[in-house]
Amino acid sequence: MLKPEWSRYIDLLHKEVVPALGCTEPVAVALAAAHAAATLGRTPDRIEVKVSGNLLKNGMGVGVPGTGTTGMNIAAAVGALGGDPQRGLEVLAGLTPEQAEAGRQMVAEGRVDVSVAQGAPLLYAEVTVTGGGHTARSVLVHEHSNIVRLERDGETVFSVPVQDLSQGGVEEKWPLTMAAIHEFATQAPYDAIAFILEAARLNEAIAVEGLAREYGLKVGRTIDENIRKHLMSDDVSTLAVKLTAAASDARMAGVSLPVMSNSGSGNQGITCTMPVVAFAKRLESSDEELARALIMSHLTSIHMKHRLGRLSALCGATVAAAAAGCGIVLLMGGGMEQVDRTIRNMVGNVAGMICDGAKTGCAMKVASAVSAGVQSAMLAMDGIGIDRREGIVEDDIELCIANLARLGSDGMQEADRVVLDIMVSKKP
């Protein structure tokens, strides 16, 4: 029987763990462009995009599915020309080669302009399209698929109130704690949580694709080749890193396969999922054991990202890998004490890894984070955990997570500004 609060946890999972095609920052722009074009009611002649600095940072260097190229401008163009606004983060699933070519031509002709929206929330996109003497505008804010306003010729056709979210803050009614997550993951009826196995299916499929072909930096594929050369061990830790990195390789290169995202991020969804899947394979875990571990991982990531904010100066893969470590602990027979140690070990180890945008190099960060996550879980199972005497770690796990969030939201604002300045100042 479901406890009343468990229904809300399930609703959170259905809201935050969803399929996404392509890196979610350029896809958010594609979605906003698709909504603007649909509101215009015809093929646009020009597109003007204004985005927050963090959204720009995460969309500059990553492949856009179906286009063979990168950047916010092509994402906006193909979103407007071939995107389906009703498909959310899979907005580009039906993109045709002809529409992709038209988008590339539009960009080449200088008919797509992208700029930074000064003073905007961390996650913000505004797309204005013109054509046939008419103009339409869409606004997306706070979440990757959260369209809050549509206008045509200056008249509002759709509008919802915009919550004044404090990125990295904590809402009073937030239902999750690590103890509550652990209770739900271990005690909820299996039939109520079995849906999470779809994350394993989708994300394993893109991992297999990443191993089969040469994508991006080939991090996962190179690990696989080195195993075959007997230069690396084929142990469970290496398998976890290999599968996760391979999936990230393919995703960052713009492969047209969906992944199950987490908190608006495909790489974080992959990182929450594939290390747990790897351990389940080697431990010969049942579907129910895998499902419970995935629930532990995905809800932990949702909880930590809620504290930290969707777009941060900190690399989100480290949070997702910490969450995966908690799922791995469950598969190895650990309990809440080991979960606590895993998170403390991660906060004391890899906290501070910067986010310098979505790109093929993310697969290397994913690999590093997963390796640390596995190490943290294994140390935790042996009774080893960093305690409050060291650095930003606290014995109270919720305070430990809050310290990490404070580092990312308050402590690294200047670092985030410098990173973006370096990126946009690069010469072509």
Curated annotation (Swiss-Prot):
Family: Belongs to the UPF0597 family.
Species classification: Bacteria, Pseudomonadati, Thermodesulfobacteriota, Desulfovibrionia, Desulfovibrionales
A Gene Ontology BP annotation from the UniProt entry: L-cysteine catabolic process to pyruvate
Record GO terms (molecular function): L-cysteine desulfhydrase activity
InterPro entries, per the entry: Ser_deHydtase-like_asu, UPF0597
Organism: Oleidesulfovibrio alaskensis (strain ATCC BAA-1058 / DSM 17464 / G20) (Desulfovibrio alaskensis)
Alphabetized Pfam families for the sequence: SDH_alpha (PF03313)
Protein name: UPF0597 protein Dde_0807
